[in-house]
From Swiss-Prot:
Pathway: Pyrimidine metabolism; CTP biosynthesis via de novo pathway; UDP from UMP (UMPK route): step 1/1. NCBIfam families: pyrH_bact (TIGR02075). The keyword Secreted does not apply. SUPFAM superfamilies: Carbamate kinase-like. This is Uridylate kinase. It comes from Mycoplasma mobile (strain ATCC 43663 / 163K / NCTC 11711).
């Protein structure tokens, strides 16, 4: 298959909000988790090595909290703990379909909950067919989980970063949810994406994460996680997406 020839080790970036279901008032919808698990089960059988970075926005938004009297640094640390909760939920979902999964945290945390992030150990797990879920963001405030994703992808020497979005199937010149006439890009250079991020105010990725991806030559596929089997399809080139390289 084309996707197998192109990529071996992938980094999947999941937002915390993408795990929630507002209609059902669920912070974590286990049907969504199970759907992701089933897709990864198929991907795993094809020989992919899968690393995951997950956000925590379904539980906590550090930026908004800082406006309500909580110092930004503390708010960000609370957000890092939120990513750990999501990582543990994903781990359980993956194990329920027979996948081996580890959680590594960039924050020092009790070993009964998660392992501390050690680069070589994480690479060893990936090489042995285990899924590694990275929690805690970068472990430092003022950095987004998008930046954590490009950082981990760089350290893990991933071939591609799959940037999962909620209800948006790629990069547009404007917010397609607001502007129906927004134009979608099939492909972009890193510099073009950086220009869009800085000038259009679109929350595709933050500028730090784009710059890091460029410096480490990490390809990015931006796609809609809500589309059925979208993780499988985007790797096969059969899902709407934007490729950045």
């Amino acid at each position: 298959m084309e996707c197998v020839m192109k990529y071996k080790r992938i980094l999947l970036k999941l937002s915390g909000e993408g795990l929630s279901n507002k209609k059902k008032s669920l912070l974590i919808d286990y049907e969504i988790v199970k759907n992701i698990a089933i897709q990864l089960q198929k991907i795993h059988k094809q020989g992919y090595e899968v690393a995951i970075v997950v956000g925590g926005g379904n539980f906590w938004r550090g930026e908004s909290a800082s406006k309500n009297g909580i110092p930004r640094t503390r708010a960000d640390y609370i957000g890092m703990l939120a990513t750990t909760m999501n990582a543990l939920a994903l781990q359980s979902g993956f194990e329920s379909v027979g996948l081996k999964a580890r959680v590594q945290s960039s924050l020092s945390i009790d070993g009964k909950v998660a392992e501390n992030y050690i680069t070589e150990k994480a690479k060893h797990y990936l090489s042995n067919g285990e899924i590694v879920i990275f929690a805690g963001g970068t472990g430092r405030p003022f950095f987004t989980t998008d930046t954590a994703a490009t950082l981990v992808a760089s350290e893990m020497q991933c071939d591609v970063l799959l940037m999962a979005k909620n209800g948006v199937n790629g990069v547009y010149d404007a917010d397609p949810k607001v502007s129906p006439s927004a134009i979608k890009f099939d492909s972009l250079s890193y510099d073009e994406l950086l220009h869009i991020v800085l000038t259009n105010g679109l929350k595709i990725m933050d500028s730090t994460s784009v710059t890091m991806a460029k410096e480490n030559n990490i390809k990015i596929l931006v796609f809609d996680i809500q589309e059925k089997d979208s993780i499988l399809k985007v790797l096969e080139g059969n899902a709407e997406h934007t490729k950045v390289e």
